[in-house]
Amino acid sequence: MYGLNHWIGPTGIFAMRRLQAYEVRSNYGFSLQMQLDMGPVGTQEDVIAEMKRCRPYFYGDYYPLLRNAESEPGWTVLQFDRGDLGEGVVFAFCAGDDMEAIANLKGLDANSNYILECVDTNEQITITGADMMSGIPIQVSSPKQSRLYFYTKSASEANNK
């Protein structure tokens, strides 16, 4: 989590020993180049499908919400927002011992409703932009875990643009 991503956009190039969400997600970018042991193909296909779902958001606004050792020690939370689509993605990485963090999202329409989906827990909630900008709680059960969230302006809100 320490590198050029604080100054330049995500590159999507990495080498790793295992397919763990924490390591994989911290290296997503416009493209994906992997150096992996040939393991179960299904797992690799899942990683590629998840990265492809994230990819359109890398062309939007980038907000580093929490950086390790700042307001939430051990957490890094990044938001990529496509205001033109009313959608975005949030990556949360827990490297420390504090299993909870609050992330205040940016660039949302405070008066609109959004559907917030946590990929890891399969939970979806409807929440206002104002509430997401006031802070969404993020929880993991142990260090070196990540959470991936997608948000979409609700269909009725998007049709009223």
Please tell me what each predicted stretch does:
Residues 1-123:
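Active-site-proximal substrate-binding groove within the catalytic cores of carbohydrate-active enzymes
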Residues 127-161:
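C-terminal beta-strand-rich structural cap/linker in extracellular carbohydrate-active enzymes
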